[in-house]
Amino acid sequence: MSDIDNNLTSQTHQQATHQQETLDLSIALLERPSVTPNDDGCQDILSERLTQAGFDCEFMYYGDRQAKGEHAEVKNLWARRGTSNPVICFAGHTDVVPTGDEKNWTYPPFTPTIADGYLWARGAADMKTGIAAFTIAAERFVANHPQHNGSIAFLITSDEEGPSINGTVKVIETLEARQEKITYCLVGEPSSTDTLGDIIKNGRRGSLGAVLTVTGKQGHVAYPHLASNPIHAAMSALSELTNASWDNGNDYFPATSLQISNINGGTGATNVIPETLEVVFNFRFSTETTEDELKAKTHAIFDKYFKDSKAKYDIHWKLSGQPFLTPEGKLVSACQQAIKSVTGTDTTLSTSGGTSDGRFIAPTGAQVVELGVRNATIHQVDEKVEVDDLGRLAQIYERILENLLLD
């Protein structure tokens, strides 16, 4: 047998081993109905394995144990092996979104099922298989290279699919307070589109939400001179707002966009001018525009139209995350090389999509990249992931560790 044949045989065997180990751990995690913010024991499974691999594991709890909703207690796991730099951290979440009516699922959402080449379960794509793949990759890397350079870390939360106020952001605050820095962060969100590794996210747009409240005076529709219609007062300003150009984007980001998601006004009666109007809108913004610039331009538009109006307006702002970008460099290159070596794919860099917990990590100075399985079924009924991708993803993650910690 030639050296080429030996290498191919070895690679095939390695992939099969990675796949079975990743599949087994994925199933163990997917069996837990960890609907946000409930971890339901997933992090205990990870902690036990990582401790055996030489990681120091620390559970971090934030929030109120007695509360529900956004103030509920959240369980987070910080695990680290090594004390030196660079620190490569895998960030992920064990919580999942609700299933909806389980009768609509082909297979029970918390009974992981292998069928037609897929692993079906809530959280299969978003993102328990990603957590499993990196865990297997870390275990195998540590076993093969116990004296590796730098450190490997895990930051796992159960508050990514919810309000995201007692999860990753609080862990990062704790790490920053004790001067514990992440050099490279690999977020295991499902980034791929058509094939494993075809897309990696090297940045995300910022998200700035707003609730506009316009207050007028209620009255009869037949006597408009005795009332002040907040809907009429806002129409011209909203028209200009939705047609405004905010920036032209850049090589990494599309132009900043605005979308109105909700408009509420009226009493339900057809003969009553309402007193108030509420409009909810959101900016997804690039690095070409700042939060303050968006606010200032928005207020300038409304000030222009409300200057002589009897109605008054107020805007409540909520920033969900600043835009971030990891330019092509060591982390991006390590990911590209790993994907190419395992799948043969030349990956594409992208900043599309919604927000992720990477928005809390990037401001610390860490290079952040998102790389995971295909995202075609995330948050949907019959969420699933290709079984063959599990072993390959674990291999990709292991190659990334080799690229960053062995040179």
From Swiss-Prot:
A Pfam family that the UniProt record links to this protein: M20_dimer
Superkingdom of origin: Bacteria
Residue ranges, compositional bias (Polar residues): 1-10
Signal peptide: none
PANTHER family referenced in this protein's UniProt entry, alphabetically: ACETYLORNITHINE DEACETYLASE (PTHR43808), N-ACETYL-L-CITRULLINE DEACETYLASE (PTHR43808:SF31)
NCBIfam families: dapE_proteo (TIGR01246), PRK13009.1 (NF009557)
The protein, known as: Succinyl-diaminopimelate desuccinylase
Gene: dapE
